[in-house]
Amino acid sequence: MAALSHRLRSFTRRFSSTRTTQRSGGGANTKVPILYTSPDIDSDPVTLQLFSWGRGASGQLGGGIEEIRMYPSPVANLLFRSDQSFSLAQTPGRIDADSSSFRIGISCGLFHSGLTIDGDLWIWGKGDGGRLGFGQENSVFVPNLNPLFEEHSIRCIALGGLHSVALTHQGDVFTWGYGGFGALGHKVYTRELVPRRVDDSWDCKISAIATSGTHTAAITESGELYMWGREEGDGRLGLGPGRGPNEGGGLSVPSKVKALTVPVASVSCGGFFTMALTKEGQLWNWGANSNYELGRGDNLGGWEPMPVPSLEGVRITQIACGGYHSLALTEEGKVLSWGHGGHGQLGSSSLRNQKVPTEIEALADKKIVFIASGGSSSAAITDGGELWMWGNAKDFQLGVPGLPEIQTTPVEVNFLTEEDECQPHKVISISIGASHALCLVSRSP
């Protein structure tokens, strides 16, 4: 792994000064790097591929240059023994029920991307503010191993607009990047060029994290929710009046959401609102609601956490916040959407806002097992490994060439290139940024 890390760092330096923007379906490099190979690999390995697409002007696509990828193209390969098992890293909004220690996860920030493999963190993209955590602010155009986590095994990551958050297997939270919004949780509103541990405000280990462009959340093993970051009167932190000395502009240290009267298992941070999910599948939310992103039937927002009235008795297994819209996945595999629909992100064949959670009819005949939201786009993965996307397609972030800039209904994303030779594939995870996306695809020999 050390030799591989050295090769990739050299590879990064070769391309980091490139300023040519290309429009293509693939990256500049014909050979896809291998970021992980299982010990004692057999002759019939399983390949897990990382794909990217959309706008990559800051290197967030990981192809080595500034480019636009109109459809999914490989970034890296991970090789596993045919008998080796792994699980997905904890994803914001998704209840983590797997106890496996070998985890793989992805996350898209505004203009940067990350991949976790068995405790290691690979990160790339725009470096302004120190969001990559390498001690400087240079952009990185290919996946680069962050050596500062060699002593801390990473469980999962959540990338924000100008900052990054990581959770270790020991239950510690690390943040780095731009600190002007207070989203780092370090008391002072300054940038951090390298990962820094958030001082404990909680009594036990952290089990889940989430972040947006300006606020961050963490859940303890006992189900208590802590939040910090920017607050502009919308109530996104859920802390209410008298939350701290700097309550007018937010809170730069973690504070317990005392008004949330039930233990929660997962959390997702939207543009100006927050959603949390209990182990029993009950959805709570709070914050801004001018676009009906809380799904309560009116546009009255506020800091006080409340359950969604129309979802009483409905068991939710995953939630996903967009900039101004929300998604929820039911136990039966149905996708519900509500909030702002101006970019088609609700998947309802309309641009109208939706006041309450409504099933996406175009996916009604499919069983969905995973959902994701970007700023104004959405995605769903079926139990058969198909990927469907909808919403804002201006920067090709839906991965399907030829779409209108606003795609109001789900379209299937294909994964066929000359090198694939039409091998069977199964999408297992997706993350969406502002104008790009990543996914993990399992390929059979």
Swiss-Prot record:
Keywords: Abscisic acid signaling pathway, DNA damage, Mitochondrion, mRNA processing, mRNA splicing, Repeat, Transit peptide. The keyword Transit peptide applies. Its main location: mitochondrion. Residues 1-22 form a transit peptide. GO terms for biological process: abscisic acid-activated signaling pathway; DNA damage response; mitochondrial respiratory chain complex I assembly; mRNA processing; negative regulation of abscisic acid-activated signaling pathway; response to methyl methanesulfonate; RNA splicing; vegetative to reproductive phase transition of meristem. Induction: Reduced by methyl methanesulfonate (MMS) treatment. This is RCC1 domain-containing protein RUG3, mitochondrial. The gene is RUG3. It comes from the Eukaryota. Regulates DNA damage response (DDR) synergistically with ATM. Together with ATM, involved in the splicing of the ND2/NAD2 mRNA. Required for the accumulation of mitochondrial respiratory chain complex I. Negative regulator of plant responses to abscisic acid (ABA). May have a pivotal role in vegetative growth and the phase transition from vegetative to reproductive growth. The keyword DNA damage applies.
